[in-house]
Design a protein with these regions (language model features):
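Structural helix-adjacent loops and short alpha-helical linkers that scaffold large soluble proteins
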Residues: 39, 117-122
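Acidic/histidine-enriched, glycine/proline-rich intrinsically disordered or flexible terminal extensions
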Residues: 146-163
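GST superfamily/GST-like fold recognition
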Residues: 95-119, 127, 133
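GST-like domain detector, emphasizing the conserved glutathione-binding G-site
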Residues: 1-93
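Short, flexible loop/turn segments with low-complexity composition
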Residues: 40-42, 140-150
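Extended, well-ordered alpha-helical scaffold segments
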Residues: 73-81, 121-135
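Surface-exposed helix-capping loop/turn segments at secondary-structure junctions
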Residues: 87-96, 138-143
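Hydrophobic/aromatic-lined pockets within catalytic cores
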Residues: 34-38, 65, 90, 106-107, ...
């Protein structure tokens, strides 16, 4: 209810600042919270993620929400991005934490839509990077389940050890 008051579009992410400013775009929220500027390479991959990969990911996961969309065709088109990312990881296995944080949620969504198919694809570097992120303590802390918060509940502080 409160989210709809501050952001009528009704989608996440939404960040409400103390001064009343509302930020509704993932990248803008990351830049605000982390106060970081993107390198040229980070901007390249995040732009491709936002403009290319996510476009096809949405149509792959939810083909019934779009007209004349073939799920397998969308999977193939999204895969082109992962093939390029795999080649990038083959030449330089580490990527910045900021870039990893920006790309990981979307690659995870893509992988989880058909995990059996995803796991047998030739992008071994992407798979290793994804597995490393899935097994990280940071991811496990982020994915801890909480009951839905309602006004009046005790504030949940993240991470829990920072309270």
């Amino acid at each position: 209810e409160h989210m709809m008051e501050i952001s009528p579009k009704g989608t996440v992410p939404v960040l409400l600042l103390e001064d009343g400013t509302v930020i509704e775009e993932s990248l803008e929220i990351m830049q605000h919270v982390l106060d970081w500027m993107l390198s040229e390479e980070e901007q390249h991959w995040i732009s491709r993620n936002d403009d290319e990969f996510k476009f096809h990911l949405d149509r792959y996961k939810y083909p019934n929400r779009y007209e004349d969309v073939d799920e397998i065709e969308q999977r193939t088109l999204a895969s082109a991005y992962l093939i390029d990312l795999d080649q990038r990881l083959a030449t330089e296995p580490s990527i910045s934490e900021a870039l990893s944080d920006a790309l990981f949620p979307f690659v995870r969504q893509f992988a989880n839509h058909d995990r059996d198919w995803f796991d047998v694809q030739p992008w071994t570097n992407v798979l290793a990077w994804l597995t490393e992120n899935l097994e990280s303590e940071a991811f496990k802390a982020c994915m801890k389940k909480h009951k839905q918060w309602v006004k009046g509940d005790v504030t949940i502080v993240f991470p829990a050890d920072s309270a």
